[in-house]
Structure formats: structure tokens, C-alpha cells
Amino acid sequence: MKPPILTIIMSTVISGTIMVLISSHWLTVWIGFEMNMLAIVPILMKKFNPRAMEASTKYFLTQATASMLLMLGIIINLLLTGQWTVLNMPNPIASNTMTVALAMKLGLSPFHFWVPEVTQGVPLSSGMILLTWQKIAPLSILYQISPSTNPNLLMTMAALSVLVGGWGGLNQTQLRKILAYSSIAHMGWMIAVTTYNPTLMMLNLAIYIMMTLGTFMLFMLNSSTTTLSLSHVWNKLPLTTSLILMIMLSLGGLPPLSGFIPKWMIIHELTKNNMIIMATFMAITALLNLYFYMRLTYATALTMFPSTNIMKMKWQFENTKNTTLLPPLIVISTMLLPLTPMMLSLF
């Protein structure tokens, strides 16, 4: 894609999200979602092949359905209250309709069907935007309407999401699908705490975005898309591969890495609100995510896959990719745990 066209499309994606973030009027929120959705489709189709076309079509159809449901909820709310204000959501039918629409946009279970397929069908850079930036706008609206949402509906979707996110990733060898299922599980953790502490949900989102950005950037640095290709990178770039494994273990929530913080704080919040069974269930399902990341770490670092290469180290050209953002992302993704007491006092 030519740089001027890419600049226009990316600025539209960013503008759409910012419009959703700053709007207090439902119509401008809906317009922001539409701008964002229409601009992201060309980014998903950056590599013009049948797989990318299929992924873009699945994404477009799902998001269009979610937008229609969102507009339906907005109209129901307008008819009953006569107001377009985002914070004014007294009717349970309107709030439930909007919650389902936002769940479809986020890829929460049982509306998760599109997330692994779309992520697998697009390039790594497009998948990175899909699993990070595209989560901000729906979660910001969910944050604003959280006092009006149905806790039982949110808890059901959260429980299904953490279960599907852990279970679905167990038999995957494609790194993009593993990250997609991990995204579903993380969204489940965020949704679980929305009713009780929405600010904690936004902290979880920030840490999740940092970890996922770091993982995708390291994958793009060495062009890894499968477990096999990642194991071969160990010969070429052992330091980079070890950083990938550290961030992936952080995504799995292994202490003492940063990914343990949101899980710890969310379980603490749920326990404080007498949701003992839900907290226990989520802690157990988190082990599924940790298991497939540990398995990936073992397969990459502690075993050597069959290779036609007879030399231990490979000849390599000088890397020309921009890595400016990687050091701070890696530090944030792995070393934030000592700051947890301060975060607990804030949230």
C-alpha cells in the first residue's frame, strides 16, 4: 500500500476512535464506529490474496451486524428517554442490546467466532492493530454505560470468554491464532470486573495492549508466524527469542511478570464483592492460557525442531526495521509487578 493512502486510512482509523472517546452524543459515537470499521478493512486487505479477502469480509459482516444492533439500542433508548446522551441509559432492553453489540465488536464469547479466523488471515501488522487499537473504542463505551449494564449478562460472557480463550488455544501452532484466543480470554477478564470497578478494566486494557504490541513487534522483527518458525529463530536471534518468550509468559499471567498484575487485582476485586465462585473459576481457566504459553516456551527454548540447516548460527543481514518502541514495551510488559501496591492504592 502506498504511503499517502496508508496515511489517510490510518488517520481515519485514529479519528474514528478519538470521536468515540470524546463524544457524549450517541449519533457521533455511532459515526465514529462506522469510520473506524470502514477504514480498517483496507488495512486488513493490505496483502491482496484470497485469505485476506475472506478475513476482511468476515470482519466487515460481523462489525456491520454489531453496528446495526448498536443503532437499535440507541433508537430504543431514544424512544424511551427522548435523549441522545451516552450516560443516560435507564432502560434494560436498550442497555442489553448495546452490551451485546459491543461484545460482538470486542469478540467476546459467544460472539468470538470471527477473531481467530480474521487474525490468522491478515498480516502481522494488521493483526496487531486488530487486537489492540480496535479494542479501545468499544471498551470506552462499555466503561461509560457500565452502571446501566446487566451484571449477570457480563459475568456470563466473561466466564465463557476466559474458558473459550483458554480452551481454543490449546491445540494451536499458529502464533496469530494463539494471540487471538489470548485476546478473547483477556477481554473476558476485563468484562468480569466492569460492573464492580470499571477503572480497573481500563488499567487491564493498557497492560494488555502493551504486552500484545511488544509480542507482535517481536514477531514482525523476525517474521515468525508458527511455532516451527519461532524455534528456528532461536538459532539466529537467541536474545530476541528469549524476549518473545518472556512477554508470552507475561501474557499468560505468570508471576513475577507484568501480566500477573491485572489477574491479581481482578481476582482481589471479585473476592471483595463476594464473587468467590467466579474468581475461582477464572483463576482455574487462566491456567489453560498459561499452559499453552508454557508449552510454546518449552518447544522453542528447550527442544530443537528438525532443520535442514547444519550450522548453529545463520548468516543474517543487518536488521533495518525500526525498533525504537520495543525497549519500553518490553520493560512495561515484564517488570511492572513491583508497582502493584501503588496501583492497588489508585484503583
Swiss-Prot record:
Biological process (GO), any one: mitochondrial respiratory chain complex I assembly
Subcellular location: Mitochondrion inner membrane
EC numbers for this chain: 7.1.1.2
InterPro entries the UniProt entry points to: Complex_I_Subunit_2, NADH_DH_su2_C, NADH_UbQ_OxRdtase_chain2, ND/Mrp_TM
A Pfam cross-reference name: Proton_antipo_M
GO molecular function term, any single one: NADH dehydrogenase (ubiquinone) activity
Protein keywords: Electron transport, Membrane, Mitochondrion, Mitochondrion inner membrane, NAD, Respiratory chain, Translocase, Transmembrane, Transmembrane helix, Transport, Ubiquinone
Catalytic activity: a ubiquinone + NADH + 5 H(+)(in) = a ubiquinol + NAD(+) + 4 H(+)(out)
Transmembrane segments: 5-22, 26-45, 60-80, 150-170, 178-198, 200-220, 242-262, 274-294, 324-344
Cellular-component GO terms for this entry: mitochondrial inner membrane
Assigned protein family: Belongs to the complex I subunit 2 family.
Function according to Swiss-Prot or TrEMBL: Core subunit of the mitochondrial membrane respiratory chain NADH dehydrogenase (Complex I) which catalyzes electron transfer from NADH through the respiratory chain, using ubiquinone as an electron acceptor. Essential for the catalytic activity and assembly of complex I.
Oligomer status and interactors: Core subunit of respiratory chain NADH dehydrogenase (Complex I) which is composed of 45 different subunits. Interacts with TMEM242.
Official protein name in the record: NADH-ubiquinone oxidoreductase chain 2
Organism the protein comes from: Martes flavigula (Yellow-throated marten)
